[in-house]
Amino acid sequence: MLNERQLKIVDLLEQQPRTPGELAQQTGVSGRTILRDIDYLNFTLNGKARIFASGSAGYQLEIFERRSFFQLLQKHDNDDRLLALLLLNTFTPRAQLASALNLPETWVAERLPRLKQRYERTCCLASRPGLGHFIDETEEKRVILLANLLRKDPFLIPLAGITRDNLQHLSTACDNQHRWPLMQGDYLSSLILAIYALRNQLTDEWPQYPGDEIKQIVEHSGLFLGDNAVRTLTGLIEKQHQQAQVISADNVQGLLQRVPGIASLNIIDAQLVENITGHLLRCLAAPVWIAEHRQSSMNNLKAAWPAAFDMSLHFITLLREQLDIPLFDSDLIGLYFACALERHQNERQPIILLSDQNAIATINQLAIERDVLNCRVIIARSLSELVAIREEIEPLLIINNSHYLLDDAVNNYITVKNIITAAGIEQIKHFLATAFIRQQPERFFSAPGSFHYSNVRGESWQHITRQICAQLVAQHHITADEAQRIIAREGEGENLIVNRLAIPHCWSEQERRFRGFFITLAQPVEVNNEVINHVLIACAAADARHELKIFSYLASILCQHPAEIIAGLTGYEAFMELLHKG
């Protein structure tokens, strides 16, 4: 069995590469122990995944067979079995949990608070003196939670008292049903297993629904359920099916049009509407409160497309105002918005091609516009023409394809000789991806407005954010409206955090230019169960697509370094040095 430390190592490496020293610091053991753990993990993972050294970045995890990998980890994860025991019993004393798990009672006592924290957004774990621990949820939700858990971790199915033959017959019957097309066969079978396991605890009254499909499926599997259990099962499935009927593409499109700032981005298309509609239908017809696999951190994706994930939060708020939907995974909707943003990245960025040979200039212009997305190549045939064009527009890049020498003050240029090659195209792509921030990060992150905030131990994140914003308003770096937007956004949850750096942000209507302010903290703070050491306040315009790439650039730079390097940044100068190195 993998121990808690080894499972934590896997968790850490799922998020990003780590050095042995960093892993040792996070787990409280020596580097030599970490290396032994990695050897044992690779042996246990048995080709489904592998941990390997990747140069200066440290060790990283590569997963080859994703489903098998997650199932193997579940076999070693006692949290699933602990939660299942709590769901299967009305009350469970700690000694009984320890006996069922064949683990010391001290382990259970230590694990219960962590289990509560792990599932705090999913269910409420409570205790009652003299009775024991229990899941404080409605009967309906307890059934769905247990069904999700049995579907996620097949090793728990014997706890429900089901034989292998029963399970095989049940799976076949559920796969062949067609009455509820939005519900997959394995989801239906997990619901039946949960009802069967809880059949003697069901007290809710459900109406009688027409049809006997469920009864036939249960009988085909060789199981027996009483009338009350069959009514509960049928009622639960029909309720979920009827809830899904209220969702339509027109509903979704109407809500999307009400999301603040979405009109200027022009990203509402048939694909986005179809993706979100399908997701909502699945959420209603087959709720999944417990994910079917371990969730990796979404922070890097949220940092790359913050506008998308913020729009998803606004959309979900509007959705909940209009419909009572148990939506439990906002991250997927954020990904759908991110995909829509990528599909509509049609703003063509200006590139000046300085060339004194007409034929070569034309060939190179066609090649660049064909192979480099979202760019517009303007040909300048002399230095004076280049100066004139630059007075009218600010080019993202100047390509010197001539014999002229450019002024040393021009720092956003590359030199390409003769007809451009594939290597030249790749050079242009790489430059465009990061040039505008890499060459002049001071333009976006200014020294004025970056300071040290002396927070005290126990000070809340909301209070810290308010105080920092108040200081920036007093110094006229951000407006009172922007401060209010930042504070409100932080209060919505799903805070943007990348490798020990929190990024409170807002979409400003005051200025189009990105503005970032780096603030160090006196004490580490825990936000969303993650430790942060510094704060980066950011204001940007959601429709300034080009400058939104700063977020993804930031994420890539921050994730290149161990967490201890980010945590050790001493101030603005150290932060800027990090960006210049990128």
UniProtKB/Swiss-Prot annotation:
Q: Where is the PTS EIIA type-2 domain?
A: 443-582
In the record, which positions carry Phosphohistidine?
Answer: H505
Q: Which UniProt keywords apply?
A: DNA-binding, Kinase, Phosphoprotein, Transcription, Transcription regulation, Transferase
Pfam families, per the entry: HTH_11 (PF08279), PTS_EIIA_2 (PF00359)
Asked if the keyword Kinase belongs to this entry, the reply reads yes
- Reported EC number(s) for this entry are 2.7.1.-
Q: Which residues bind DNA?
A: 20-39
Superkingdom of the source species: Bacteria
Q: Which PROSITE patterns match?
A: PTS_EIIA_TYPE_2 (PS51094)
Citing just one GO molecular function, the answer is: DNA binding
Transmembrane residues, as ranges?
Answer: none
| Function statement | Could be involved in the regulation of the transcription of the FRV operon.
Entry note about domains: The PTS EIIA type-2 domain may serve a regulatory function, through its phosphorylation activity.
**What name is this protein filed under?**
Putative frv operon regulatory protein
Whose protein is this, by species? Escherichia coli (strain K12)
Q: What is the lineage of its organism?
A: Bacteria, Pseudomonadati, Pseudomonadota, Gammaproteobacteria, Enterobacterales
